[in-house]
Structures are given as structure tokens and as C-alpha cells.
């Protein structure tokens, strides 16, 4: 049985949590298989800034954002499911932006094959592993995570958990979040990417034309 992170792990500042989730593995049990993906990209959100759902106020749909750290907040984005974890402070959370398929003794090649069946490309063909979870809705589809099943719930170590498997990014890229409308605090550098997996995330922050110090920063471990 995988060893789940405890709820208190999530009861931290959203930016701290967003960085510390990089390298952790999400596992979702579907049938007899533990589908798994290593988190490579996260975004922090605060109630006090305009880019967050919580800044629009409390509603029943958004209640998970206002619960203590370690609650699951899921919503629909562009027709797909998105996964967030509440952090310390009402309205603060971390969006799991992208991940990379993870295989080990618990989550084997059969689990990866099931993830590929869950998330074919637009033509119905099998996606290569490196593109399988390269976006917030893609990772939920690959892992079989659905809004009705998990929104406002706690983790269940028998079915859904986050595990520390000993993988720590050597460097983290800090940059601006994606898809934030103009005038909604789009300038805030609340997006964090495992530098070793930058080319597999939603949008590579190291792509041509991006300038270090202007568009992104490198954070070494301990920063």
C-alpha cells in the first residue's frame, strides 16, 4: 500500500506547498490498478489576489477552497476536469498544472497502459507517455479523476493519495501563471516547474524568447 502524505503537509502557504509538491506522486486506484503521475508543474492561488476563484467569493461550488489544507477542489476547465489542493488560509490553493507518468512496483506498466487508454489523442491514437499528463485536464483524464467523485473531499489512502517517493527537483523554475486574464494579477510569479521536466509541462517556460530574470527565475533547492 502506498504511503500517503498526511493532511498537515498541505496546511502551508500556497507558494511553499506548490514548490514542495513538485516531485511528489499522485496515485489513484482504478479497479486493481494504481494509476500514477509525478507532479512537474503547479500554480499557487490566494484569496487576496484577482487570479483566484476564491477572490470571486464563497459559493457552495468553491467551498473546498475555504476548508483547511488538504481538501480537494475540482472544477471544469475547457470541458475537462482540473485538480487542486487547498492550502493554509481560507481561499488559498494549489492547482496541479501538469505531471509525468510514474511507474514503479506499485504502479506498473499495466497502470501506464490504462492511463493511455483513458486519454487518447484527438484522433483516438495512443498518446506517448511524455504528453499524457502535459496539462491540467490531460492529467485528470489520464488518472481517471472526475469532479463529481472528488470535489470537496479529503484524500482516501485506499483510493486517492499523494506520496513522497524521494524525488526532489534539482532546480525549480518560477514564472507567471497561464491563462490569467489581463488585469487579474497575471504578472504574479506563482507558477512553479520542475526544471528537469520543463519541456513536458503545459508550456515550456524555457522556450525561445523567454529571458531569465524577466520572464522566469531559477530557484535552487533551499531557496
Curated annotation (Swiss-Prot):
GO terms for biological process: base-excision repair. Keywords: DNA damage, DNA repair, Hydrolase. Its EC number is 3.2.2.-. The keyword DNA damage applies. It comes from the Bacteria. InterPro entries: Formyl_transferase-like_C_sf, MPG, MPG_sf. The keyword rRNA processing does not apply. Pfam families: Pur_DNA_glyco. Belongs to the DNA glycosylase MPG family. This is Putative 3-methyladenine DNA glycosylase.
Amino acid at each position: 500500500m502506498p504511503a500517503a502524505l498526511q493532511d498537515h503537509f498541505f496546511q502551508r502557504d500556497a507558494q511553499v506547498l506548490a514548490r514542495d509538491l513538485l516531485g511528489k506522486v499522485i496515485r489513484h486506484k482504478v479497479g486493481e490498478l494504481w494509476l500514477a503521475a509525478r507532479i512537474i508543474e503547479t500554480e499557487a492561488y490566494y484569496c487576496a489576489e484577482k487570479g483566484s476563484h476564491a477572490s470571486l467569493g464563497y459559493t457552495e461550488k468553491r467551498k473546498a477552497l475555504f476548508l483547511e489544507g488538504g481538501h480537494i477542489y475540482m472544477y471544469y476547465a475547457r470541458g475537462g476536469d482540473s485538480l487542486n489542493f487547498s492550502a493554509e488560509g481560507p481561499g488559498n490553493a494549489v492547482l496541479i498544472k501538469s505531471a509525468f507518468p510514474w511507474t514503479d512496483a506499485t504502479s506498473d506498466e499495466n497502470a501506464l497502459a490504462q492511463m493511455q487508454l483513458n486519454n487518447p489523442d484527438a484522433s483516438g491514437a495512443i498518446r506517448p507517455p511524455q504528453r499524457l499528463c502535459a496539462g491540467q485536464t490531460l492529467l485528470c483524464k489520464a488518472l481517471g479523476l472526475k469532479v463529481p467523485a472528488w470535489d470537496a473531499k479529503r484524500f482516501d489512502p485506499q483510493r486517492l493519495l499523494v506520496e513522497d517517493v524521494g524525488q526532489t527537483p534539482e532546480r525549480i523554475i518560477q514564472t507567471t501563471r497561464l491563462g490569467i486574464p489581463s488585469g487579474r494579477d497575471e504578472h504574479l510569479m506563482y507558477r512553479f516547474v520542475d526544471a528537469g521536466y520543463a519541456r513536458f509541462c503545459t508550456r515550456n517556460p524555457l522556450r525561445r524568447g523567454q529571458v531569465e530574470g524577466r520572464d522566469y527565475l531559477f530557484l535552487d533547492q533551499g531557496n
